[in-house]
Regions:
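Conserved phosphate-binding loops in N-terminal lobes of ATP-dependent enzymes
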Residues: 42-135, 218-239, 244-246
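Conserved phosphate-binding/catalytic loops in two-lobed NTP-binding clefts
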Residues: 156-169, 263-287
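A short acidic (Asp/Glu
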Residues: 28-29, 142-147, 172-175, 196-201, ...
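A short acidic Gly-Thr/Ser loop motif
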Residues: 12, 18-25, 180-197, 202-204, ...
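Early-domain small/polar-rich strand-loop-helix modules and first-structured segments
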Residues: 1-95, 152, 160-164, 169-172
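Small-residue (GG/TT-enriched) beta-loop-alpha framework at ligand/catalytic clefts
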Residues: 134, 149-232
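Glycine-rich phosphate-binding loops at beta-strand->alpha-helix junctions
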Residues: 132-143, 238-265
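Acidic, glycine/GT-rich loop-and beta-edge segments that sit at the periphery of enzyme/chaperone cores
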Residues: 280, 287-298
Length: 298
């Protein structure tokens, strides 16, 4: 990836959105005309509740669907048939049995996208978006096909649609931050799963244009539930960073809830900026939408 992307005409005069989608959660960020930075949709207006459970539920006694936390709560009460794993099921083109009826997994994914995109409506109607970028954990032909087909059912005729991986989303997020945050390497620690996943952003400023790289790695030994998790995370960070000049670290994912990583945090904060949050990927996708990408879904 090259920083010439940054020099393209941005879509600053139009509304854009970034949508991070996994089997577990969805998240939506948007940017309105003239605004410098994306904002993220929260399920609660007075809280930073950005993660939308990627769930659908159909009531057992009527043909009525709910999504997200409502589906989660209704399932706990035994009121709905719950459908999860929407992205993977759609990628596999599965037929999903719900309450004795079969449904297309792509159609179910499209329904979930429609319901979640409706959260944007009070701010900007989805059909008025200039560009919409989806960020997924891994880009593949089945995922591309599933998202393309599901989005195609939404009728977003005016929006340019894109699909990127999380590494590319991280790239766009970085280059849209103040340059002092990425003048050296940038590390992202993602603990949203059962083990740690890292992305390391580096920029070779000796080339023209500047060449940027994102190196991904899984650290399965840094797993949720370990009694010595702080020590294990600390040793992993020391090994990964080594003699690199890392100027900034992002900690994202529900695995970083609580205070279990105090020793690791003390190490990471030594001459580095450290940020804790969980909406980086959707913001990165939104920044990508503003940058005027070139690889369309359709």
């Amino acid at each position: 990836m090259f920083l010439e992307h940054r020099e393209k005409e941005e879509n600053k005069r139009q509304a854009t959105a970034g949508y991070d989608l996994t089997d577990a959660y969805a998240q939506i960020s948007y940017c309105l005309p003239g605004e410098p930075c994306p904002k993220t949709i929260s399920l609660q207006a007075d809280q930073e509740q950005y993660l939308i459970p990627a769930l659908l539920g159909r009531y057992t006694d009527q043909d009525l669907w709910v999504y997200g936390p409502k589906a989660q709560a209704a399932a706990a009460a035994g009121e709905v048939f719950l459908v999860d794993g929407l992205l993977t099921k759609a990628a596999h083109q599965e037929m999903v049995e719900v309450g004795g009826q079969n449904y297309s997994s792509v159609a179910l994914l499209s329904l979930f996208l429609k319901r979640t995109m409706s959260l944007l409506a009070p701010i900007v109607r989805p059909e008025r978006l200039q560009a919409l970028v989806f960020s997924v954990p891994e880009v593949s032909v089945p995922i591309l096909s599933a998202v393309t087909d599901a989005v195609g059912m939404l009728g977003l005729k005016n929006a340019s649609l894109f699909l990127i991986g999380r590494a590319e989303s991280f790239f766009y997020y970085n280059i849209c931050q103040p340059e002092e945050l990425w003048k050296q390497d940038v590390l992202l620690c993602d603990f949203s799963g059962t083990f740690l996943h890292t992305l390391l952003f580096t920029a070779n400023r000796k080339t023209s244009p500047v060449a940027c790289f994102v190196e991904e790695a899984d650290w399965k030994e840094v797993a949720a539930g370990r009694e010595d998790l702080d020590q294990c995370f600390l040793e992993t960070m020391k090994a990964l960073i080594g003699d690199r000049n890392v100027s900034c670290v992002y900690l994202i994912g529900e695995g970083f809830l609580g205070e279990w990583y105090q020793e690791s945090l003390r190490f990471l904060c030594q001459e580095r900026r450290v940020f804790l949050g969980n909406n980086l990927y959707s913001k990165g996708a939104c920044y990508a939408a503003r940058q005027g990408m070139t690889c369309l879904l359709y």
